[in-house]
Amino acid sequence: MSRELITKYPQIEDYSTIWMENITHTTAKGSSEFGLSNTNKLIRQYEYATGLKTGSTSGAKFCLSATARKDGVNMIAVVMAEPDSKTRIKDAIAMLNYGFGKCSIYQDEKALEKIVYAEVKHGMQEKAKGETLEGFRYVDTSGSDLSAVEKEVQIQKQTAPVKKGDQIGEVIYRLNEKTIGSVPVYATEGVGE
């Protein structure tokens, strides 16, 4: 549920990281101001914390769905049925630190460093220009040296007509000769017959 919330509604972070806020309550009898503080003490105690939600009842005890971001990696730690608030924070920090210690991320914001072209047979032009619409991200948990990631641009020959937006190739990423992902290359212009 936490992953869905932060993925679909990233603006939740703007609210869940507020430590303390003064609220003005206005009624027919007038207005009064009161301070509202966040029950998620993690946001004050852990430098990478980005939120999210605490809860406690006599049956469920102390629970926390904690989110944090470090070096471009987002983590979620969920602790339930803790005996007290301090323990839930301590255990969430331990889980987040463990996750950050095990994960590293490879990012290639610009999959193509130069303009690429696909050959077009029977077209009004001989080539179709291509580009990627997104970068590439890979999360590694094996401890591999991510500086060893290699990428290869593969562009396929096309037969006219080629429509703008047609996939004409891909950028393939490999680590230790194993494919770890790819990014499609799309035609940025159409080529008629």
Language model segments and positions:
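Domain-terminus/edge residues, biased toward the C-terminal soluble/receptor-binding domains
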Residues: S2-E193
